[in-house]
């Protein structure tokens, strides 16, 4: 049977030929315009931009300082009214001075309280910051189970049961030496010179010299 025919006997269409890219296609792809990479800024341009940014920042700081001075002047003008001293006698001037001193003392007390609060807050912030740094450098401690201390005998008893006593009796296999045997051995060892003299016949000669 012909391979180009299917089971019904009809002719199947021939597959499309595989087209390969020629060298011309590759050359065309290479010459196509692609997205250009950004150019690097030169050192002189960077220096110029930094100088410009510093100038702008300096102008902003000067403007903010001028605004703060203006706000301070307006606050002082509203709180501290100009004094009217015309037509005041000596006693009235003394009363006015006492009132001004009292106001100054009150303002100093308030300023001291505010400074104390600010110092306390700064100290607390520094302590909290240090605690944060300490916590970052530590590992989180896992929750441990309750530890129950148990002796070695109790542990072996729980593991081995009745065999624990036999296992833990380590001195059972050691050699037992009685005290009497030890004294006898010491006594025998201490008389070794006398035994040698008796065996060699030197005991009588020693008595002659001693006499």
UniProtKB/Swiss-Prot annotation:
**Keywords (A to Z) from UniProt:** Acetylation, Actin-binding, Metal-binding, Muscle protein, Phosphoprotein
| Alphabetical list of Pfam families matching this protein | Troponin (PF00992), Troponin-I_N (PF11636)
In terms of superkingdom, the source organism counts as Eukaryota
> Which InterPro entries does the protein's record reference?
Troponin, Troponin-I_N, Troponin_I, Troponin_sf
Q: Which residues carry this modification: Phosphothreonine?
A: 31, 51, 78, 129, 143, 182
Map out region (Disordered) in residue numbers: 1-43
Which biological process annotations from GO are given for this protein?
Answer: cardiac muscle contraction; skeletal muscle contraction
Which segments carry the region annotation Involved in binding TNC?
Answer: 32-79
| Residues modified as Phosphoserine | 4, 22-23, 42, 44, 77, 151, 200
What PTMs does it carry?
Answer: Phosphorylated at Ser-22 and Ser-23 by PRKD1; phosphorylation reduces myofilament calcium sensitivity. Phosphorylated preferentially at Thr-31. Phosphorylation by STK4/MST1 alters its binding affinity to TNNC1 (cardiac Tn-C) and TNNT2 (cardiac Tn-T). Phosphorylated at Ser-42 and Ser-44 by PRKCE; phosphorylation increases myocardium contractile dysfunction. Ser-22 is one of three sites in the region of residues 1-48 that are phosphorylated by phosphorylase kinase.
Question: Hey, where's the site called Involved in TNI-TNT interactions on this chain?
Answer: 80, 97
Region called Involved in binding TNC and actin, residue ranges: 129-150
Carrying Phosphotyrosine, the residues are 26
Q: At what positions is N-acetylalanine found? A: 1
Assembly state and interactors? Interacts with TRIM63. Binds to actin and tropomyosin. Interacts with STK4/MST1.
PANTHER family according to UniProt: TROPONIN I, TROPONIN I, CARDIAC MUSCLE
Q: Which family does it belong to?
A: Belongs to the troponin I family.
Role summary: Troponin I is the inhibitory subunit of troponin, the thin filament regulatory complex which confers calcium-sensitivity to striated muscle actomyosin ATPase activity.
* Official protein name in the record: Troponin I, cardiac muscle
What organism does the record attribute this protein to? Oryctolagus cuniculus
